Amino acid sequence: MSNGTDSKTASAPPARSGGGFGGGGSRGGDRGDRGDRGGDRGDRGGGLGGDDDKRGGGRGFGRKKVCRFCAEKNASVDFKDQATLKYFVTERGKIIPRRISGNCAKHQREVAVAIKRARGIALLPYNAVVG
């Protein structure tokens, strides 16, 4: 079954140029032709690996955040207590996440519900106070 071309001598299909979903555009070439574009990822250590010693270490502290509601047994989450709830809201009116506030999951959920209730009865603003 020979039709004039041998599979061993057949050339590669022609390269696509431009258009389509390939993202090639009219610039030509493929990603292998880019070379070093002078980015600073190498300077910052953009990889995911460890080896913090070559960059000067990680954080300067290792103190674990503790949930203040678990630490103080008499502290409770109350939607009417504006002073406590303002500690868990940013200046823009967003609820501070658990990894920053240090709350446990249970009390973070209670704080979020309390903030939403306080907003509903106008004790806390929904958004930032402009002025």
Swiss-Prot record:
Residues 1-10 have a biased composition (Polar residues). One of its GO terms (cellular component) is cytosolic small ribosomal subunit. One of its GO terms (molecular function) is structural constituent of ribosome. Pfam families: Ribosomal_S18. It comes from the Bacteria. Keywords: Ribonucleoprotein, Ribosomal protein, RNA-binding, rRNA-binding. GO terms for biological process: translation. Belongs to the bacterial ribosomal protein bS18 family. Part of the 30S ribosomal subunit. Forms a tight heterodimer with protein bS6. Binds as a heterodimer with protein bS6 to the central domain of the 16S rRNA, where it helps stabilize the platform of the 30S subunit. This is Small ribosomal subunit protein bS18. It comes from Myxococcus xanthus (strain DK1622). The lineage of its organism: Bacteria, Pseudomonadati, Myxococcota, Myxococcia, Myxococcales. The gene is rpsR.
